[in-house]
Amino acid sequence: MINITLKDGKVIEVEKGVKVSDIVMKISPALYKKAVGAKINGEIAELMTEIKEDSELEILTFDDEEGRKTVRHTSSHILAQAVKRLYPEAKLAIGPAIDNGFYYDFDIDFTFTPEMLEKIEKEMAKIVKENLEIERFELPREEAIKLVKDASEPYKVELIEDLPEGEVISFYKQGDFVDLCAGPHLPSTGKIKAIKLLSVAGAYWRGDEKNKMLQRIYGTAFLKKSELEAYLKMLEEAKRRDHRKLGKELDLFTINEEGPGFPFFHPKGMVVRNILENFWREKHTKAGYDEIRTPVILNEELWHRSGHWDHYKENMYFTKIDNENFAIKPMNCPGSILVYKSHLHSYKEFPMRLGELGLVHRHELSGALHGLMRVRCFTQDDAHIFMTKEQIKDEILNVIKLIDSFYKVFGFEYFVELSTRPEDSMGSDEDWEVATNGLKNALEGAGLEYKINEGDGAFYGPKIDFHLKDCIGRTWQCGTIQLDFQMPERFDLTYVGQDGEKHRPVMVHRVVFGSIERFIGILIEHFAGAFPTWLAPVQVKVMTITDSQKDYANKVVNDLKEKGIRVEFDDRNEKIGYKIREAQLQKVPYMIILGDKEVSENKVAVRSRKEGDLGAISLKEFVAKLNYEIDNRIVENSK
């Protein structure tokens, strides 16, 4: 007999070699119906896994991220099996679970059409109904290669040949379908009650543009049809809010073929951008930050010294100046470090907070580019803080409070993750432990719940990630706090302590928006282009019913401009109904409609985007209303 410790601390005794599924049934038949996987001693496992020693056991359901991935990973195999049944000539590439769904890449001589997707989806439904048992088996390298060669699957051969010697090579079988896969998977295909194929796109094999273009079928899966219906409804709403569409319609930005991944901000987009940057400066000045600016191009040696060369060079751009190799910076931290090193520092200056709205460039594959959300050049709202070890907790708490104060202004809820040491990290175990505990202590001191994201820290230190939740339930990773003992060591940073001796400072890297461009994209979608008054590129649109009101309208426009209001005058010879509809499409917060009555009474008829017709009021009263919204950064309900 062995002892199994459950997540709630309860210990149960079971027979050695018992399957997880049998333990779940023993715990609760209701839980058995919901269970999709497990964690054994912190490692992801399947319900079919046998436990042979005392272990800690956590049962995973679809409510858990790892549980959803298991369901969707199995769904990708169901997709591949359906395609192979219908189109046996298709060659299989890869098919992982991804955020909110799954995909599978196929090599086939024709393009999948919407009608074909419907046919594939029906075949997938048959496979689910067949409730095929899913079995895992392992093979030695040579036998594994023979299996996939005999099946005429060249991409699988390449994957196996690239595995390190001694690596476990596993396959999963459901009915007559076999696929190379590390898992995990469900016990059978019948557990999945709702699958939907969403789209087809091109994808280069292994993401390399030099390789063959494959066809990628995207889909999603749920255990309940009602959950799938809600998700599809959210996707429709997301299309309506797509920042790429709205960015063009509202004349905010474009991305041109002359510069893929390099956004062009138009005048109205620059208004939004400048407001955000000035807001950032205002908040940071009050919080004790000093702003700096560092060069975009720095020599190659600097990136070797910082460690970015070893960990990041595939994402960097390079150039040559006077026969010397230079790199376009992918991050701002080395420049900030050089500012710190420009003279000697005392502990009395700590914590030293250096902020920078720094332009960085990172090479992204063309297939990964997506409007403002995934670009090749962007502005990071970085700050680097230098401090003593004793100041870690208090300073991280200050940063957490600062980030929280930013997100509250926009009405965002958020959740927090603590990302720990990755495999390709640098530095000692002791430094990583101190850094990780420092972040944990600060999070607990702030009273924030957080999730551990194992192995997803930066190469130089652990980090706290802030994930914003938008009005349709999607999440976006924005703010980050990273604790770093490595850069100060690599650059030999020092300060003079109370004892008069030189000591090594601790460094914090942190962002609030993350990327100005991406944050603007998030705001466009969150507000569906209807920015709150303080952020709107045009706050007021003035329009006349006939030409006889033009002189009065010009006076109103000039008065508003003098008071700092962003106003446009629509003096076109069009019907007033047409002008109103145009302003509504441009999502202007307020319209002023002027007729003879308003001129004679020296008033303005105001129409609000949110509240509708507000009637005729004095310009002074209207400006007071505007200023209240602007000064207090009022945010309307964005739904």
UniProtKB/Swiss-Prot annotation:
Substrates-to-products reaction catalysed: tRNA(Thr) + L-threonine + ATP = L-threonyl-tRNA(Thr) + AMP + diphosphate + H(+)
Bound cofactor: record note: Binds 1 zinc ion per subunit.
Entry EC number(s): 6.1.1.3
Keyword set includes tRNA-binding: yes
One MF annotation (Gene Ontology) recorded for this entry: metal ion binding
Main localization (coarse): cytoplasm
Xref: SUPFAM superfamilies: Class II aaRS ABD-related (SSF52954), Class II aaRS and biotin synthetases (SSF55681), TGS-like (SSF81271), ThrRS/AlaRS common domain (SSF55186)
One GO CC term on file: cytoplasm
Classification via InterPro entries: aa-tRNA-synt_IIb, aa-tRNA-synth_II, aa-tRNA-synth_II/BPL/LPL, Anticodon-bd, Anticodon-bd_dom_sf, Beta-grasp_dom_sf, TGS, TGS-like
Record's keyword annotation contains Oxidoreductase: no
Pfam families: HGTP_anticodon, TGS, tRNA-synt_2b, tRNA_SAD
GO biological process, one term: threonyl-tRNA aminoacylation
Cellular localisation: Cytoplasm
Cofactor: Zn(2+)
Sequence ranges assigned to domain TGS in this UniProt record: 1-61
Quaternary state and interactors: Homodimer.
PANTHER family named in the record: THREONINE--TRNA LIGASE, CHLOROPLASTIC_MITOCHONDRIAL 2 (PTHR11451:SF44), THREONINE-TRNA LIGASE (PTHR11451)
Identification of the protein by name: Threonine--tRNA ligase
